[in-house]
Each structure stands twice: as structure tokens, then as C-alpha cells.
Amino acid sequence: KTTMSILECILVEAKEGTIKFTANDMELGIETVIEGNILEKGTIALDARIFLDIVRKLPDNDVTIETDDSFKTIITCEKAKFTIIAKSGEDFSYLPSIEKNDCVVISQYTLKEVVRQTIFSIADNDTNKIMTGELFDINGSELKVVSLDGHRISIRKIDLKNEYTPKKVIVPGKTLNEISKILPG
């Protein structure tokens, strides 16, 4: 449970024909952008659990989100209508921008399989923070993913289609778990 209530929210930003949804708990952040008909640009923060429960129950049709200056928000779809109180998005912690010129390309299936085959051997306690994640070691046209918990070690090597500048990063296990839930397959 987070102590900052804004971190339990989804930031909804409407502008110029797009709606951006952002969630961030300071450890894991996710963002998606969809097309939409915007009558007036604006930003609000909606309680993530309530918003998800509402959207999950809506029929597969167009959804309208309206809000006023006091952040009273009305969500409608066909005959369904929900009223909730949102928050100002001013206190929301935005995701850092990442330069996309330093990317490695692998298939979604491969990434999901690599995580599945290595995630079991990450440490589940915070005594050694570095062991609660996985090392992604890029060297030329090879990606090596390594995880260990002090008793077990998992190593998975993948041949990449392109050559890349050598780089090593540790990705938190929590992040990898969430990514693997999102990926198809």
C-alpha cells in the first residue's frame, strides 16, 4: 500500500486527438496512448482500482469521460453512467523520457520466454537489492540474461539479429513480472 495517494491513480491526459494513460508507483511505470475525440484538452488523475473496475464492466463501445473544474468525473458508455471524484494531475510523478536510439529488438515471445525461464531464481527479499532483478548483458549480437538468488543461478543466451554496443542493465523482477503479464502468448 502506497503512502502517496496520487500513486494509486491513473493519469489521463487528453490533447490533440489522443488520450494518454499513465500509471506509476515510483518503481514501475506504464504508459499507453490511444486515439480519441477531444472536445477540450485536460489532465486528471483517476483512482486506478475504481477506474479499472468501471472500465472492465463496460460494453465494448465508445467511452466518454467528462470532468469539471471540481474534478467530478462522469464516465459513460451506452446506458452505463458512473460518477467519481478525480484529482488534479499536478502531483502525479511523470515517467522519465527514454531515448529510443539505444534499443535492442527482440520478439515479444522471446522476451516472455526468457523471463519465464529465468525469473524463478531472483531473490525475493531486499537484503541484496541487486539480486531482486535480472542482468541483461548485451554484447554484439548476443543477449545474456542472468538471475541469481544466492542458491540458484539462471543464464539464458539469445542470438540477436543485429549488432549492438555492449551494455549491461539490471531490470527489477517486479517490472519483468508485470511485462510478462502484458505480453501475448
Predicted regions and their residues:
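Structural preference for solvent-exposed beta-strand-turn elements
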Residues: 1-185
